[in-house]
Amino acid sequence: MRGVAICVLLLSLIPGNAAGSAARQETVDRIAARVENDIILLSDIRALSRYQQFVDGKSESDAQILDRLIDQWIVRIEAGVARFPRPFDAEIEHSLERVRTSFPSTEEYEARKKQSGLSDAEMREMVSAQLYLSDYLDSRFRAGVQIDPKTIEDFYQKSVVPMAKSRGQEAPTLEAARDSIQEALVQRGINDQADRWLIESKARLHIEKLLDEATK
């Protein structure tokens, strides 16, 4: 579940100038969903859409993003109840650096960031929240994921070797790739368990989606 790593920015509404006429004021935000006694705003969807556009060069539909935000709400509430610690500044900086180095060049990173409209503060908040949620899910589900040697070998033969051949490269040895394969399979297992947990959690919650009304 890749969705679950991304922050929810509750952007404040900026009041209009008191000296201005009522006709000049306009609604700048709407409620996209109610989850229990909380709300998710249309601006939250827009913020996550901009972040996806920045990281991936494209974004999901509003409905898909809303589902991700509901998932994030559940994880955030559970992490809060568990008093799960927030990431340290050094961890946030490391994650930000990983985002930067995922681009071919600094120029492309800056250009994409400018295109998305994200400020440095918004970027940091997004990355911090993503790290917090993903770390909580890791701590909750990792111990329950067991990977046997046969599964690692199968993944090596069916995924690693063919991918290397398709790129005209020599595949690493199984032993050289073992740790990386195991971690990838553990992450897949965490995602699978988290997905099942989220489905069960949503079934117990009062969730009212108002996205169609919010976009009118």
Label every PLM stretch briefly.
Residues A5-G16:
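Bacterial N-terminal signal peptides
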Residues G16-A23:
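Signal peptide processing junction and immediate N-terminal pro/mature segment
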Residues R24, V28-I31, I39, E60-K216:
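Peptidyl-prolyl cis-trans isomerase
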Residues S43:
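His/Glu-rich zincin catalytic helix
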Residues R46-E60:
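Short, surface-exposed, low-complexity cationic segments
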